[in-house]
Amino acid sequence: MGLPKSFVSMSLLFFSTLLILSLAFNAKNLTQRTNDEVKAMYESWLIKYGKSYNSLGEWERRFEIFKETLRFIDEHNADTNRSYKVGLNQFADLTDEEFRSTYLGFTSGSNKTKVSNRYEPRVGQVLPSYVDWRSAGAVVDIKSQGECGGCWAFSAIATVEGINKIVTGVLISLSEQELIDCGRTQNTRGCNGGYITDGFQFIINNGGINTEENYPYTAQDGECNLDLQNEKYVTIDTYENVPYNNEWALQTAVTYQPVSVALDAAGDAFKHYSSGIFTGPCGTAIDHAVTIVGYGTEGGIDYWIVKNSWDTTWGEEGYMRILRNVGGAGTCGIATMPSYPVKYNNQNHPKPYSSLINPPAFSMSKDGPVGVDDGQRYSA
């Protein structure tokens, strides 16, 4: 026997009312903030980030941008179905063009090395279900590129710092400024953007790289200090590219070392990301270089652990978790152009993450990984 029409109508009315109340509650920040309250928030934000505007009309112009950013944040976070949050950070009163031209410095183009088969998927290959090179001591603290499009240098240096630690056991913070000042090429122009692989090639050609302490970061282009360039503390042997658009190969590579990648970071959601697993929206027009330092799964959602160079005020203390295993180019194009430095030890290649955390379960040869560990198995 069916339910009475009056009962069905009352039920629909009840649930519709609940939905309206829920939306109203979630949108309360949008409707209850007065202009004076938002102004007070902006003044506090200006103090926090050390900003001030003195030219006529500039404060008012920036305040309008801030208000729109706050509206975007409130609308995004009101949706409880989203897997990540956004928030106010140092970019809150920048226009999209200012943000892109200042902070996105990856120059896309053809890579100059052939793709290596070192991390090609192998039938039956099993990878750890979780990797975090931070816990293995192979990741230097978050750095800030400042108002310089030198993300390519930060990504290259982060992977060199990582492989050096994995091979030698010593973690040394290295000099991005040396790459920016001394590593210029036709396509790599310091704070005006560049190739990650040009950074690797400079270190190889130079016979090494200096430390951050000796050649400190200035967030601007400078003349190459030849005396400091000749102080070489860390070397690499070569660099290679992970097979393109292949997240399993990328996962294999990250099992053995941090990996440089580029992605599309131009959208508002990426710019204001604060926590959770980022799922977009974003495209695949890669414009920003970062470093993958691990991967994992939370609540059934696979993710990459990404180290950025926008200070600890962005994201999860400077890091982002971004959706993994979506196929093709990956979320925001993260699997489009991965690359990594190679530094040989007596066994020709570093040990994987699992052997540094637990008893060794892999062995390495110059041709690639051999062996298995607990985790995810690849099948063709």
Curated annotation (Swiss-Prot):
<keyword id="KW-0020">Allergen</keyword>
<dbReference type="InterPro" id="IPR013201">
    <property type="entry name" value="Prot_inhib_I29"/>
</dbReference>
<feature type="active site">
    <location>
        <position position="151"/>
    </location>
</feature>
<dbReference type="GO" id="GO:0006508">
    <property type="term" value="P:proteolysis"/>
</dbReference>
<feature type="signal peptide">
    <location>
        <begin position="1"/>
        <end position="24"/>
    </location>
</feature>
<dbReference type="GO" id="GO:0004197">
    <property type="term" value="F:cysteine-type endopeptidase activity"/>
</dbReference>
<keyword id="KW-0788">Thiol protease</keyword>
<keyword id="KW-0378">Hydrolase</keyword>
<feature type="active site">
    <location>
        <position position="308"/>
    </location>
</feature>
<feature type="propeptide" description="Activation peptide">
    <location>
        <begin position="25"/>
        <end position="126"/>
    </location>
</feature>
<keyword id="KW-0325">Glycoprotein</keyword>
<keyword id="KW-0645">Protease</keyword>
<dbReference type="InterPro" id="IPR039417">
    <property type="entry name" value="Peptidase_C1A_papain-like"/>
</dbReference>
<comment type="similarity">
    <text>Belongs to the peptidase C1 family.</text>
</comment>
<keyword id="KW-0732">Signal</keyword>
<dbReference type="InterPro" id="IPR025661">
    <property type="entry name" value="Pept_asp_AS"/>
</dbReference>
<feature type="disulfide bond">
    <location>
        <begin position="148"/>
        <end position="191"/>
    </location>
</feature>
<comment type="function">
    <text>Cysteine protease responsible for the cleavage of kiwellin into kissper and KiTH.</text>
</comment>
<feature type="active site">
    <location>
        <position position="288"/>
    </location>
</feature>
<keyword id="KW-0865">Zymogen</keyword>
<protein>
    <recommendedName>
        <fullName>Actinidain</fullName>
        <ecNumber>3.4.22.14</ecNumber>
    </recommendedName>
</protein>
<keyword id="KW-1015">Disulfide bond</keyword>
<dbReference type="InterPro" id="IPR000668">
    <property type="entry name" value="Peptidase_C1A_C"/>
</dbReference>
<feature type="disulfide bond">
    <location>
        <begin position="282"/>
        <end position="332"/>
    </location>
</feature>
<dbReference type="InterPro" id="IPR013128">
    <property type="entry name" value="Peptidase_C1A"/>
</dbReference>
<dbReference type="InterPro" id="IPR000169">
    <property type="entry name" value="Pept_cys_AS"/>
</dbReference>
<feature type="disulfide bond">
    <location>
        <begin position="182"/>
        <end position="224"/>
    </location>
</feature>
<feature type="glycosylation site" description="N-linked (GlcNAc...) asparagine">
    <location>
        <position position="111"/>
    </location>
</feature>
<feature type="glycosylation site" description="N-linked (GlcNAc...) asparagine">
    <location>
        <position position="29"/>
    </location>
</feature>
<feature type="glycosylation site" description="N-linked (GlcNAc...) asparagine">
    <location>
        <position position="81"/>
    </location>
</feature>
<dbReference type="Pfam" id="PF00112">
    <property type="entry name" value="Peptidase_C1"/>
</dbReference>
<dbReference type="InterPro" id="IPR038765">
    <property type="entry name" value="Papain-like_cys_pep_sf"/>
</dbReference>
<dbReference type="Pfam" id="PF08246">
    <property type="entry name" value="Inhibitor_I29"/>
</dbReference>
<dbReference type="InterPro" id="IPR025660">
    <property type="entry name" value="Pept_his_AS"/>
</dbReference>
